[in-house]
């Protein structure tokens, strides 16, 4: 239970980090509720809405599985994402090699986990080596610019490869009609949450330039980072979530068991005391 409630609290800024989740309504009817968001949400929110200090975008729904090649070694890999430099500004994932400020700043860069570094490069220094990624839509060559620790098991984010966001085709960078990214914002105060949710639909109107989803009201739910794991499962989640109700039920069950054990102990103690009193009497 303690483990389930510890998710994503390893990041020092977690009380101010929120995931931006997409909502779509027709009139008052909620028709869609997704964990993912548009590629363009983060930058537009930072530019137009007060209270957002920073943001990051993670694109992992576009090409989550790719062929990765290094020299003669060719493997099919998953847990591949595209991330912008804000990733290491918001999250405290440890970088063992490389510079957090620059490792995702240019096209054609990739940060890999320590396990992946051993898998492809054995004892060689991976920094500066080239990995070739071939997905359903794009093929790119990336220079390894960082090696990070494995992401903790009590994180809802788990990737083996982080490719620089600008490695994606330019038209996708701010594209509003592909909700295939995960957006996280850093707020100057948690009190901004309701204000941003209220103002987002008004802001969204000027970005809805295509017919797709134009008949719907675009909105967002801002979910605190530490709450993501135990909130209800939505469409396009990164991973299967935990169950808050089940965790609470376990806590109450544990309390009940302890209470019963305590009552039994008291009853047994009283019974023994009375028995000794009769023996003395």
Predicted segments, located by residue:
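The feature marks short, hydrophobic/small-residue-biased sequence motifs that occur predominantly
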Residues: 39, 49, 58-61, 69-99, ...
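Mid-to-C-terminal secondary-structure elements
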Residues: 81-97, 108-245
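Membrane-interface helix-boundary signature
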Residues: 240-253, 277
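Membrane-proximal extracellular/periplasmic loop immediately following the first transmembrane helix
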Residues: 3-65, 170-172, 178-184, 188, ...
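Acyl-group handling in specialized metabolite and lipid biosynthesis
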Residues: 28-33, 72-75, 240-241
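Alpha-helical transmembrane segments of integral membrane proteins
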Residues: 247-267
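Intracellular coupling helices
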Residues: 262-281
